[in-house]
Amino acid sequence: MASSTINTLKPTANRSTARAARAALTPALLALAGIVMVGAVLRFNCLDCYGLWYDEVSSVQVAQRGVVAILTDRFGWMRVQTPLHYLLVWLSLKPLDPTTSAVLVRLPSVLAGLLTPAVVYGLGRETFGRAQGLLAALFVAVSAVHVSHSQDARPYVFLALFTALSVYCLLMCERTGERRWWFAFAAATAANLLMTYHALTLATPAIAPYLLWVLYKVWRGRDAEGGRVRLWGAALSLAAIGAVGVVMLADILGVPRVPPDLSLFSPASVGDQLGRMLNRLGQVGVEREAEKTLQWFVAGVAFLGVLFGVRERRFRAVTLCLLMLVVPALLMAVLRTTNSVFQRYVLFTMPFYFLLLANGILAARLLLRATWKWKQAGRAMSGALGAGALVLFGLGLYVYFSPEQHKQLSFLPDYRGAARYLTERAGPGDLIVLLEEPPQGMQVLDFYWHGTPPAPTFDGIDPRLHAQPAPRNIYWVMTYALNDPKYLEALRNASPPGHNFASVAEFDRLLVLEENNPGDVLPSLRRMADRMTAANPPFSPSLQALFTLQGSLMQARGDTQEAASLYRTAGPFYLLGDEYLTTAEGFHTRGDRSAAWREAIMSLFLEPYRPQIHTYLAQLLNEEALSPQSALEQQVARDLEFRN
């Protein structure tokens, strides 16, 4: 009878436990739904306020080449992104011309961005607890940095989503041992690998140590009930991931990059990369010194989260988060020895940083719990830290959505507005000259003009520019990084008598300066270079850009040795010259001379001291019957080789 009573009550007890669990879960899910809605509002807000920028246009133009070209004919920098990324962009282009509106092109990133907080909540629930998961999800939802990438038609927000989802599935594999979670882990990881190469080079290596630990536990428990089934599920999942990884590795080996040089690596560079990474993840976009102070505060609270996690014996959670932060910093430091790396590559580390931050905030309420009064003080401290963090994120959103301030958080020059303005003003007898750092405007303006500019358009360092006849007007398109009126005033004050600007059009991060009856092109370009030199400190453009421009002017005058000296002084802007030179050669082979010139000029700007670039430019000039300019390029190449 007793046995019967126990058996009767056991299902009832289980049902009661399940009901209690559901009752406890409901408020958390409602809060999570609210967080996702807030994130959606922020990511859809002002989605088309700015036109597509250089990287987005690059993705769009590769996608516009068609499915066959995406799968079989990528070359140069086109191979930096995966076919799946380009196919997704290709699909988004079908309903609407991206030069008319950027909404549909950016929509996939928006959707990935608003789903990420939900996955972050799951991560928090499986590591530190439900409250930490909700708080970290809220931080991701209102992070201006994450919002910025969610409004960018690039794959970085997908990398963050799929990495978080992969880790969540792995945690569920560890806790439940169910095959479905192994298959979900394989699917999420494969999607990550197919979407971006950074999943292969940065995210997967960060996950690998924890994955090995989980696999060890599965192997150790293989003789337990269901152990063999779990082992086979893990093995099949790893086989699928390995197959996708091998395919993507074979593809990435075609990217023209220089292998890392470990002789240039130092342990201090890991700390430097970690600091840069954390600064970017929590960035709010204020003045540099204030930003540094705020990020030290955020990092300090996250460190408190590490200490409290260890104190509460949450070793698994702390280890996982630290792996996801330290391993990418290490890999970035190694890659940086010979390549340019950018902090957007490690956006996927944000959820793990914010989990530590959330744990640090909630830990404060438990540090002081000896008496009731101390408990109240601890709760007040925790509330103050949480409120302070939300104020910081709110400040970041204000800066990001303020047209006059968002420049600190994202690079969104208004090429769309400048293209419309120039279409209305410039004509066949005019000349449009771009003076930028780096020279991205040629590609973006050409995109918005559908390949038909209103007037001949050249970058300021293009050697063809010096052979152009005297124009009626010159429209100077300049990078205006600081949007500081003092820079414009300095340019005007540096103008020689009789050569003031007839009109000035200001766009976000761009200036369009109209100069009437400028005379011959080369003297006009020299005057503009002198203006920029006089106005430079402490404004944009950088000295590197000015050295390259001055070198091109010396080259046009025939002083190739001085030109070579200036090119060497300029040094590299980014170590990406090979990618762009290879891309130029690819376009040249396919008969697209306009694109070949554009990529060659970008390569020249990035690494002007490389003889190979000048040799290639000499070839292009010779094909256009510009023999004097071709001879000068060849001589510069020889001078650079001699000095090297």
Predicted feature locations:
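Membrane-proximal lumenal/periplasmic loop motifs of glycosylation machinery
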Residues: 44-52, 68-90, 94-106, 339
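Membrane-interface alpha helices of multi-pass inner-membrane proteins
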Residues: 39-40, 136-137, 149, 181-197, ...
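Hydrophobic, aromatic-rich transmembrane alpha-helices
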Residues: 37, 116, 120, 210-221, ...
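Transmembrane-helix motifs of polytopic, lipid-linked glycan transferases
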Residues: 37, 107-127, 165, 307
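Catalytic lumenal/periplasmic loop and adjoining terminal transmembrane helix
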Residues: 196-198, 246, 386-515
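Signature aromatic-anchored transmembrane alpha helix within multi-pass, membrane-resident enzymes
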Residues: 33-34, 238-240, 297, 301, ...
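Hydrophobic/aromatic-rich transmembrane helices and adjacent perimembrane loops
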Residues: 149-150, 159, 201, 293-296, ...
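Membrane-interface transmembrane helices that cradle and orient dolichyl/undecaprenyl
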Residues: 12, 126-131, 166-184, 216-220
